[in-house]
C-alpha cells in the first residue's frame, strides 16, 4: 500500500541512489542479497513501500536506474548492494550525454526514454496503490538534468495524479564541474517548475561545509556527502514505512508546504549531525534536535534562510518522544523567530513523529522548509547563465543538437519570474492581504 517508485538518473543520481538503498535496506533489515535478516516485525510491516517481494521471499527494490553511459551502472552493480536490484531495471545507453542538456533531453536521451518508460510502467503495475515517484538527479550534467527532466515530463503525462518528488543537486557556487552548468541547470529548473510537485534542493558545497564544520571530516568524499543526502531521503518517507503518532506522506507534505503551486523548491536539513569524536558528549533531546535542525549551517543548499522568510516548514521527528514536547518546541521556534516566518500563513510549521529512529541513534529529525531565501540559488545560477548567454558562449553545443535559442530565453525568463515570485511573497505583509479582503467585502454594501 502507498508505494513509492524510485528513479535515479545520471552519474550523480545513481551514486546518491545507491547510497540511499544502503540506508533503506539497513533500516528494514534486508541484506545485500535481498533476504530479510532483521529482528523486528515493524521492519516488515510496510516494507512494500520501497520493495517488491519476489516469489522466493527476496525483497527487490522498486528502483529504476538509468544513465546514458554504462560506467556508473557498472559501479552500482559491483557495489555492496548491486545484486539486490532487478537486472532488467538497469537501462543505459553507450554514448554518454557529455554534460549536454540537449543530448539528454532531445537526442541521446529521447532514444532511450521509451525503454525507461517501459520499466517504469512495469514497476508501476506491480504497485497496489502507487503514491508517487522520487527522482534523484543533478542539474549540472547532461543525463540527470536533460534526460531526468524528460522522464519527469513523460511520467507527468502518464500519471498526472501521482506525486512527483525530486532530489535535485544544484551546481555549487564556488565548485564547478563543467563550464555549461548554468545552462543545464536553468533549462532543468524551467522543467521542474512545471512538472514536479516537490523539489528538495541540494548542493555539494553546502554538504561539504556540513562535513567540514559540523562533522569535522578533513577530506570529505562524495560517499560522505551522499550519506547526508540519503539520511534526509529516508527521513522524508519514514512515516510511510514505520508506524508513528503523527503521520505524513508525500501528498500531506505537499499540501502543508506549498502555498502557491510554482513555489515548490525546499531546503532540507537533518539532525543530529555530530562529529564522531564529540558524539558521546551530546544529549539527544527534542530541544537540542530542534535547535540544530533550524540552524542555518544545517541546510543542505547554499542559501541562508536568515536572508528570507519561511512560507512554510515541516519537521519530521523519529524516535520515542512525546508529541506534546514536539509541538511545544515547534511553537517555541515560531514565537522566538517570528520575523523569519510570513505572518499571513497561520500555523505554518507542520510536525510529524515516527516511532522508529534511524540505525544507531535514539532520535533524529528531518527538516524541510519552503523559504523565500532559496531565490539566492536561482539568482546565482541566473547571473552565471546571463553572463554566458549574452555572449552566446558554448551555444553551438546545444543548437547543434537541434535546440533553438528561444528555449534558452524562455527558460531564463521563467527562472527570473520564479525569483521575483519568491521576492514578492517575502515582501508581502498581512495588511496588504487584509486591505484586499476589505475591498471585496464592501462591494455588496454599495448595491
Swiss-Prot record:
InterPro entries: Beta-tubulin_BS (IPR013838), Beta_tubulin (IPR002453), Tub_FtsZ_C (IPR008280), Tubulin (IPR000217), Tubulin/FtsZ-like_C (IPR037103), Tubulin/FtsZ_2-layer-sand-dom (IPR018316), Tubulin/FtsZ_GTPase_sf (IPR036525), Tubulin_C (IPR023123). Its main location: cytoplasm. Expressed in leaf sheaths. Its cofactor is Mg(2+). Residues 411-447 are annotated as: Disordered. GO terms for molecular function: GTP binding; GTPase activity; metal ion binding; structural constituent of cytoskeleton. This is Tubulin beta-1 chain. It comes from Oryza sativa subsp. japonica (Rice).
Amino acid at each position: 500500500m502507498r508505494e513509492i517508485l524510485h528513479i535515479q538518473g545520471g552519474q550523480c543520481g545513481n551514486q546518491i541512489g545507491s547510497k540511499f538503498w544502503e540506508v533503506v535496506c539497513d533500516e528494514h533489515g534486508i541484506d545485500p542479497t535481498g533476504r530479510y535478516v532483521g529482528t523486528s516485525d515493524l521492519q516488515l510491516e510496510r516494507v512494500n513501500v520501497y520493495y517488491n517481494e519476489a516469489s522466493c521471499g527476496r525483497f527487490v527494490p522498486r528502483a529504476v536506474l538509468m544513465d546514458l553511459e554504462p560506467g556508473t551502472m557498472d559501479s552500482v552493480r559491483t557495489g555492496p548492494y548491486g545484486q539486490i536490484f532487478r537486472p532488467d531495471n538497469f537501462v543505459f545507453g553507450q554514448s554518454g550525454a557529455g554534460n549536454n542538456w540537449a543530448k539528454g533531453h532531445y537526442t541521446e536521451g529521447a532514444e532511450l526514454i521509451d525503454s525507461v518508460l517501459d520499466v517504469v510502467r512495469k514497476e508501476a503495475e506491480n504497485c497496489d496503490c502507487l503514491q508517487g515517484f522520487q527522482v534523484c538527479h543533478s542539474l549540472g550534467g547532461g543525463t540527470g538534468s536533460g534526460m531526468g527532466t524528460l522522464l519527469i515530463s513523460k511520467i507527468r503525462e502518464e500519471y498526472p495524479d501521482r506525486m512527483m518528488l525530486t532530489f535535485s543537486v544544484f551546481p555549487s557556487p564556488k565548485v564547478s564541474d563543467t563550464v555549461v552548468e548554468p545552462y543545464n541547470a536553468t533549462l532543468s529548473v524551467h522543467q521542474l517548475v512545471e512538472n514536479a510537485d516537490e523539489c528538495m534542493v541540494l548542493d555539494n558545497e553546502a554538504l561539504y561545509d556540513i562535513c567540514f564544520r559540523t562533522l569535522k571530516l578533513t577530506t570529505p568524499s562524495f560517499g560522505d556527502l551522499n550519506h547526508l543526502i540519503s539520511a534526509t531521503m529516508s527521513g522524508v518517507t519514514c512515516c510511510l514505512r514505520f508506524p508513528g503518532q503523527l503521520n505524513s506522506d508525500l501528498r500531506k507534505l505537499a499540501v502543508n508546504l506549498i502555498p502557491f503551486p510554482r513555489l515548490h523548491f525546499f531546503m532540507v536539513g537533518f539532525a543530529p549531525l555530530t562529529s564522531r569524536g564529540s558524539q558521546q558528549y551530546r544529549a539527544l533531546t527534542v530541544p537540542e534536535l530542534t535547535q540544530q535542525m533550524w540552524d542555518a549551517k544545517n541546510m543542505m543548499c547554499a542559501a541562508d534562510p536568515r536572508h528570507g522568510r519561511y512560507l512554510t516548514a515541516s519537521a519530521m521527528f523519529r524516535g520515542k518522544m512525546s508529541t506534546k514536547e514536539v509541538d511545544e518546541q515547534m511553537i517555541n521556534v515560531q514565537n522566538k523567530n517570528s520575523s523569519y516566518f510570513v505572518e499571513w500563513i497561520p500555523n505554518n510549521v507542520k510536525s510529524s513523529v515516527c516511532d522508529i529512529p534511524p540505525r544507531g541513534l535514539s532520535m533524529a529529525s528531518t527538516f524541510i522548509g519552503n523559504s523565500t531565501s532559496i531565490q539566492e540559488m536561482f539568482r546565482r545560477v541566473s547571473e552565471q547563465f546571463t553572463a554566458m548567454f549574452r555572449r552566446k558562449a558554448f551555444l553551438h553545443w546545444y543548437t547543434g543538437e537541434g535546440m533553438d535559442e528561444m528555449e534558452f530565453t524562455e527558460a531564463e525568463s521563467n527562472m527570473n519570474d520564479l525569483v521575483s515570485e519568491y521576492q514578492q511573497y517575502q515582501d508581502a505583509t498581512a495588511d496588504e492581504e487584509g486591505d484586499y479582503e476589505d475591498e471585496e467585502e464592501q462591494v455588496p454594501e454599495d448595491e
